[in-house]
Amino acid sequence: MGAPALPPLWTALAIAVTLGSAVTLERWLRARFAAGKLAFGAAPPLQLPINDILAVFGVLWLSVYWPGGIWFGLVGAAAIAAVLRLHRIPLRRHFGLGTLSVWQWIGLSLWIAAAVFVPLQLLAGGCEKAFEHFGWPTPHEPAVDLFLHAEGWRQLALLFFAATVVAPFGEETLFRGFIQPLLRRQLPAWAAIGITALVFAGLHQHLLTLLPLFVFGIVLGLAYELSGSLLLCIAIHFWFNGFTALLLITGYGPQP
């Protein structure tokens, strides 16, 4: 069942925030490019022996079978950090942890999330309408079902933490912090970003949201490629998942 409409005032506010964020962000990016302060290649490529790459993915594969969906991201992040340390690759430099100040990555991530959240929700709604038109099933994402069937505020709080902290940290470390830099070593930026975004969308195993998640993956990949800051990607992902979770909690997301 589709999501109920927001009250008119909230709808108008969401549109105003989206348009304002998108227009000002586009102008800021254009000015930064023109001034030579922004360019592709800020994120360092990564080269590792094939055995170590396979070991990371082997650990990820095993973690899928462990109880609790959060293990996949956390175990993956731990395995990646261990491999990087093994090869004496500084985590701070590789993940760009000092590239932006705290206020810069918080503010910029909120700016980007505010610009893309509503368009991606509209794209997801369009995909749902298309599926319904062709008579294809439109099941919820597993994570959405967990929110819809949560029992009590304690379980909701745990789900909110998993969605806004654990998932962004684990997924961004894996996709933007590991897979994209590995591909970037051999491929141009656009190809590395696109392939990583496709894998990111596909591993969510939800055909209905494949296109919106792919576009979101492109946004995250561009953010990492242009800033070199994994924290920026984690924060964008935090805001996006947080906005989505708030819609579900307040009853304005998909219905059971």
Task: Label each region the model flagged.
Residues 20-27, 161-185:
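Transmembrane alpha-helical segments in integral membrane proteins
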Residues 1-104, 245-256:
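N-terminal, membrane-interfacial amphipathic/helix-forming hydrophobic leader that caps
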